[in-house]
Regions:
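Formylglycine-dependent sulfatase
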Residues: 1-269
């Protein structure tokens, strides 16, 4: 991959790096979702743009770089994950997920109200993006588009095409999987994000998502029910349970990445 990983292949994300720009020393001023988005939009630190944490309503009256692009003659669009509560401003077109948004069948906010779409969210965001690029813009004007995916956010629900990918293989474990956080600053030990202790039944796909269509649920259950049955019968404990949790987590994560990579390729093509 562009950053040297050999666990999975991401040819389209790698193409972005090859044909665009890659950062080896990139930093954020606020690492959680909504504040980081606000910093990108405004170019201001969180205490100046007002978005200090998740759950706050972004002040869309302030200056943002999409507004400056509009003033310079660009058509602008925002599609996908917004997560800032207020409606997007500075965009000629927008269609955004509500809050975090689900992985399947997302309701999407638009200037005309809520639009409900059936399908896998990563594919849908790309579909809307391509439709605007082909049919929604003035092709005589320059354009700027923010096409922002939910994936691979927790709880890592793979798309229907990838539900069984990586089955039958063991992916390498990271050296930090059994980290005891000794001699580390306290936040490292107090965070609630360990594979061992903090993955829920939903994270581990021990039950199907509740918002699937009958067809989607049938595909989901066909993929996960046999694996979950084998897990229940194994009655794993201790380190063997940790190993199982890691494999379930990392495979679902990479399955989500595969969908993102495919859809990046659709846009680039």
């Amino acid at each position: 991959s562009a950053y040297g990983s050999n666990r999975n292949k991401t040819p389209n994300i790698d193409r972005l790096a090859k044909e665009g720009m890659i950062f080896h020393r990139a930093f954020v001023t606020n690492s959680i979702c909504a504040p980081s988005r606000a910093v990108i939009l405004t170019g201001k630190h969180s205490h100046l743009n007002g978005q200090l944490t998740n759950g706050m309503r972004f002040d869309g009256e302030q200056q943002t770089f999409p507004k400056l692009l509009q003033k310079s003659g660009y058509q602008t669009a925002m599609i996908g994950k917004w997560h800032l509560k207020s409606d997007p401003t500075g965009f000629d077109f927008w269609q955004v997920l509500q809050g975090q948004g689900p992985y399947y069948n997302p309701p999407m906010n638009t200037p005309d109200g809520v639009k409900r779409i059936t399908g896998y969210t990563t594919d849908i965001i790309t579909d809307v993006t391509l439709d605007w690029l082909k049919n929604g813009r003035d092709k005589d004007k320059p354009f700027f588009i923010m096409s922002q995916h939910k994936a691979p956010h927790r709880n890592w629900q793979p798309g229907p095409k990838h539900l069984n990918k990586y089955d039958g293989i063991d992916l390498p474990e990271p050296e930090t999987l059994r980290d005891d956080y000794k001699n580390r600053l306290s936040p490292a030990a107090t965070q609630a994000m360990t594979v061992k202790n903090h993955l829920s039944a939903n994270d581990l796909k021990l039950r199907a998502p509740g918002n699937l269509t009958p067809e989607q649920k049938a595909k989901w259950n066909a993929a996960y029910d046999p694996k979950n049955k084998a897990f229940a019968e194994a009655k794993l404990e201790g380190d063997e349970l940790l190993k199982w949790k890691y494999q379930r987590y990392v495979k679902d994560y990479l399955r989500c990445i595969d969908s993102v990579d495919e859809n990046v390729g659709r846009i680039l093509d």
